[in-house]
C-alpha cells in the first residue's frame, strides 16, 4: 500500500512539474501585459464595442470593477435560477428555485465557492447549468486570478500606482487561459466516457427488471472548468463520485492534475514576473511540503479502517464507506486532500464517511485559509498574505524594518494582512456558534455528538474559505443555512479581496530597494521553514479548541475498547 500511495502521489507531482512551468510562462506574459499580436485587432474592436478604455487603473478603480462585475453576476444568476421554469433547455420541466436557495447558489458560484444545497440532476435545467453555473465557473476563476495579477504587479513595479486594467485582465484570462484549457480537458473527459449532450433523461431497464431514469446533460464541458477554475460544483449531486462525471481511474488522475494546475503554474508565473524565479519556487515548496504531509495523514487514517468494525473483530481492509470501488481508498483520500487544499470542493468520495482523523485534515486545510495551492488566484494571494506576516515577524526578531522583494512592509500593510487573515476564521467560528445556538441550526444535524458538531464546523469552514465541499449529513437546504452561508461566502471572498487590493495599492507606490547584507532571504530553506511555522501556528491557535470538540473528540470515542451505545 505504501508503494501504491507513493506512486500515486509521485505521478501527480511529476505531471504538475511538467505542465505547470509551461503554463506559468503564458501567465507571466499576461501579468506583464504583453499583447498577443494575432489578437490585438480583435481586442481593440471589443474594447470599442463594450465602451471600455483599456487604460491602467489604480487599486481603487480596479477593486470597484471587480466588485461591480461580481455583483452583476450574482443578480443575473439569481434571476436565471428563479425563472428557469419559464426558459428553454429544460426537458425535465424543473421549476425555478426557491428564492433563498437561488440566492445561496448565485452567491456560491460567483464567489468561486460552489457550495451546493441542491442536487443538480433533480433541480436545474440545462440552461441554468450552462449559461448560469458554467459561465460563473469561468468568471469567478478569472476574478480571483485578476486580483492576484494586480498584487503581483504591485511587487514587480517601481513607484507606479497603476495595477493593470481589470476588464482587460478578465478578458485575457478567460480567452487565453481558461477557455483553451477547458476545451482540451473536456475532450479528454469525453474520451474517458464523461457525457456531453442536451438530451432528455433516459429510461432504462435495470438488471433486476425494474425501470431506472438516467440523467443526461452537458457534463464534460462543465466538468473541465469546474476543476481548472477550482470551482468544484458538480453537475450531479454525487459530484465526481458519479460515473458520468468521473468514470475511470485516468479521468480521476486528470481531475486532480487539473485542480492543481493553475495554482502551481501561478507560482512559476509569480517568480518570473518579479524577476526572481526562486521566489515562486519557495512558495511552491511551502505548499508542496504541507500537502504531502496532509495527503500521507489522510491515506494512513483511511487505511486503518473503521474502529467500530475493528472492535468487533472484523477486518474491514480499510475504510471503504462512502468511497467508489473504481477508485479505492488511496485515490479517494488523495482526491480529498487535493480538493480541500486547492479550494476546489469537488469530491469523488463522501467526506462525511471518512474516519475522524481522515475528515479532520481536509477540514483543517480549509481552515488555514486555503493557502496550500488554494483556489485559482486566491490561493497564491492568500499565501502572500502569510509571507508578509512571516516577514513582519522575522523583522521583529532581528530588529529590522521588514521588507519583501525590495519593498518595505509598513504598519498599513501589516494591518491589512492581519485583517485579511483573520476574517475567514472569525466567520467560521462565529457562524458555527450561531448555528449551534439556534434551533434552526441544530435541527439540521442528524448525527448528534462530536460528529454533528464537526458537520457544522466543516460547513462554515468550507463556506468562509470558498471551498464548497461538505459533510453530507447536515441538511442545509433551509432558509436559515441558505442565507447565513450566503453571507459567510460573500464576506469570506470579498472581505479578503478588499484588503489584498489595498495592500497592492500601497506596495505599488513604493520603490524596489536592492537587498542589503541584513535583508532576510525569502527564497531559502530557512524562510520556507519560517513560513510553514507561521501557517501552522496561526491555524493551530485559531482552531485547536474547535477541532478538539469535533474530530479529535470523535476519534477518542471511536478508539475506545467498546462501541458507544
Swiss-Prot record:
Keyword Transferase: no
Membrane topology, as annotated: Multi-pass membrane protein
Keyword Transport part of the UniProt annotation: yes
Primary location recorded for the protein, binned into one broad class: membrane
Subcellular location: Cell inner membrane
Superkingdom of source: Bacteria
GO MF term list: P-type potassium transmembrane transporter activity; potassium ion binding
TM stretches of this protein: 6-26, 63-83, 132-152, 175-195, 250-270, 283-303, 327-347, 354-374, 379-399, 418-438, 483-503, 524-544
GO cellular component: plasma membrane
Matching Pfam families: KdpA
Alphabetical keyword list: Cell inner membrane, Cell membrane, Ion transport, Membrane, Potassium, Potassium transport, Transmembrane, Transmembrane helix, Transport
Subunit text: The system is composed of three essential subunits: KdpA, KdpB and KdpC.
The family this protein is said to belong to: Belongs to the KdpA family.
PANTHER family: POTASSIUM-TRANSPORTING ATPASE A CHAIN, POTASSIUM-TRANSPORTING ATPASE POTASSIUM-BINDING SUBUNIT
Role description: Part of the high-affinity ATP-driven potassium transport (or Kdp) system, which catalyzes the hydrolysis of ATP coupled with the electrogenic transport of potassium into the cytoplasm. This subunit binds the periplasmic potassium ions and delivers the ions to the membrane domain of KdpB through an intramembrane tunnel.
Record's protein name: Potassium-transporting ATPase potassium-binding subunit
Protein source organism: Edwardsiella ictaluri (strain 93-146)
Lineage, top ranks: Bacteria, Pseudomonadati, Pseudomonadota, Gammaproteobacteria, Enterobacterales
Amino acid at each position: 500500500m505504501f508503494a501504491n500511495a507513493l506512486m500515486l502521489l509521485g505521478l501527480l507531482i511529476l505531471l504538475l512539474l511538467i505542465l505547470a512551468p509551461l503554463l506559468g510562462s503564458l501567465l507571466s506574459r499576461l501579468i506583464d501585459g504583453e499583447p498577443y499580436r494575432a489578437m490585438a485587432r480583435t481586442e481593440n474592436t471589443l474594447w470599442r464595442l463594450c465602451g471600455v478604455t483599456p487604460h491602467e487603473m489604480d487599486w481603487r478603480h480596479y477593486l470597484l470593477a471587480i466588485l461591480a462585475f461580481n455583483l452583476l453576476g450574482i443578480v443575473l444568476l439569481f434571476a436565471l435560477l428563479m425563472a428557469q421554469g419559464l426558459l428553454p433547455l429544460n426537458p425535465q420541466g424543473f421549476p425555478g428555485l426557491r428564492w433563498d436557495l437561488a440566492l445561496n447558489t448565485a452567491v456560491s458560484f460567483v464567489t468561486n465557492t460552489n457550495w451546493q444545497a441542491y442536487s443538480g440532476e433533480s433541480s436545474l435545467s440545462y440552461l441554468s447549468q450552462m449559461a448560469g453555473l458554467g459561465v460563473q465557473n469561468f468568471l469567478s476563476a478569472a476574478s480571483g486570478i485578476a486580483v492576484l495579477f494586480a498584487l503581483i504587479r504591485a511587487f514587480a513595479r517601481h513607484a507606479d500606482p497603476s495595477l493593470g486594467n481589470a476588464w482587460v485582465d478578465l478578458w485575457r484570462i478567460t480567452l487565453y487561459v481558461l477557455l483553451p484549457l477547458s476545451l482540451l480537458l473536456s475532450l479528454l473527459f469525453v474520451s474517458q466516457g464523461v457525457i456531453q449532450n442536451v438530451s432528455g433523461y433516459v429510461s432504462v431497464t435495470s438488471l433486476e427488471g425494474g425501470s431506472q431514469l438516467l440523467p443526461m446533460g452537458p457534463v464534460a464541458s462543465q466538468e473541465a472548468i469546474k476543476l481548472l477554475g477550482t470551482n468544484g460544483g458538480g453537475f450531479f449531486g454525487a459530484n465526481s463520485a458519479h460515473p458520468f462525471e468521473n468514470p475511470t481511474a485516468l479521468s480521476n488522475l486528470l481531475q486532480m492534475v487539473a485542480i492543481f494546475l493553475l495554482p502551481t503554474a501561478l507560482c512559476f508565473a509569480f517568480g518570473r514576473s518579479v524577476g526572481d524565479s526562486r521566489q515562486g519556487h519557495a512558495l511552491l515548496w511551502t505548499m508542496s511540503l504541507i500537502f504531502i504531509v496532509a495527503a500521507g495523514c489522510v491515506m494512513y487514517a483511511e487505511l486503518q479502517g473503521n474502529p467500530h468494525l475493528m472492535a468487533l473483530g472484523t477486518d474491514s481492509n480499510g475504510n471503504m464507506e462512502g468511497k467508489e470501488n473504481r477508485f479505492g481508498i488511496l485515490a479517494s483520500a488523495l482526491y480529498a486532500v487535493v480538493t480541500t487544499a486547492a479550494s476546489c470542493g469537488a469530491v469523488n468520495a463522501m467526506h462525511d464517511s471518512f474516519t475522524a482523523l481522515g475528515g479532520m485534515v481536509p477540514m483543517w486545510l480549509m481552515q488555514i485559509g486555503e493557502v496550500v495551492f488554494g483556489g485559482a488566484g486566491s490561493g497564491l494571494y492568500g499565501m502572500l498574505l502569510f509571507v508578509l506576516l512571516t516577514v513582519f515577524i522575522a523583522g521583529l526578531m532581528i530588529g529590522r524594518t521588514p521588507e519583501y522583494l525590495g519593498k518595505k512592509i509598513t504598519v498599513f500593510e501589516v494591518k491589512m494582512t492581519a485583517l485579511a487573515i483573520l476574517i475567514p476564521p472569525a466567520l467560521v467560528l462565529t457562524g458555527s456558534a450561531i448555528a449551534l445556538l439556534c434551533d434552526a441550526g441544530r435541527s439540521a444535524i442528524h448525527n448528534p455528538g462530536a460528529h454533528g458538531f464537526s458537520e457544522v464546523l466543516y460547513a462554515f469552514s468550507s463556506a468562509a474559505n470558498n471551498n464548497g465541499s461538505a459533510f453530507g449529513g447536515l441538511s442545509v437546504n433551509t432558509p436559515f443555512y441558505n442565507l447565513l452561508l450566503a453571507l459567510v461566502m460573500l464576506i469570506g471572498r470579498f472581505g479578503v479581496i478588499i484588503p489584498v487590493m489595498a495592500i497592492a495599492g500601497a506596495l505599488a507606490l513604493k520603490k524596489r530597494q536592492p537587498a542589503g547584507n541584513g535583508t532576510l532571504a525569502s527564497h531559502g530553506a530557512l524562510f520556507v521553514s519560517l513560513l510553514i511555522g507561521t501557517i501552522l501556528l496561526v491555524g493551530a491557535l485559531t482552531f485547536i479548541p474547535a477541532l478538539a470538540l469535533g474530530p479529535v473528540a470523535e476519534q477518542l470515542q471511536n478508539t475506545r475498547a467498546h462501541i458507544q451505545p
